[in-house]
Regions:
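STAS-typified acidic loop motif
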Residues: 2-41
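A short, charged, amphipathic alpha-helix used as a generic interaction element across diverse proteins
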Residues: 120-126
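Conserved beta-strand segments of alpha/beta enzyme cores
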Residues: 10, 81, 110-112
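Amphipathic alpha-helical interaction surfaces in cytosolic regulatory modules
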Residues: 26-107
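Short acidic-hydrophobic, aromatic-tinged amphipathic segments that line or gate anion-handling sites
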Residues: 106-120
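Broad hydrophobic/π-residue packing in well-ordered secondary structure
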Residues: 11, 58-61, 114, 123
């Protein structure tokens, strides 16, 4: 019998930009990663945004399997921009090591990074 996974994300709109806040503290297991991906994709299917902010302020650990969730979202929003904000040090380091974000704006990466939600919104509005 599979275990029920609590809701892992919630959506809001800030300045006409869809913001998905990941409510999980850790993403370690495949079923949790797939559930998170599916929740975010459902949000995207309902709002059909051209850009997205992922707020990872509550997330303090993401295992390698967790990146499947974020890459699935990236693939779904292929032509749009995704800015990740409020990353803890270890989460930021994992995204950087995996080259999913880049400290060099001239170097393309699948995701953009911002320190705060406000700076993520500002980045997408510029």
């Amino acid at each position: 019998m599979s275990q029920l996974i609590p809701k892992l994300a919630r959506a809001s709109v800030v300045d006409s930009i869809t913001v998905v806040t990941v409510t999980a503290e850790q993403i370690r297991e495949a079923d949790q990663a797939y559930a998170l991906r599916d929740e975010i994709l459902e949000i995207l299917n309902q709002s059909n945004p051209s850009c997205l902010v992922l707020d990872l302020g509550k997330l303090n650990f993401v295992g390698s399997i967790g990146f499947l969730a974020f890459l699935g979202v990236r693939r779904h929003l292929a032509g749009g921009r995704i800015v990740i904000c409020n990353m803890s040090g270890p989460v930021h380091d994992m995204f950087a090591v995996c080259q999913l974000i880049s400290p060099d704006p001239a170097k393309k990466a699948p995701f953009e990074a911002a320190k705060t939600l406000d700076s993520a919104i500002a980045r997408l509005k510029s």
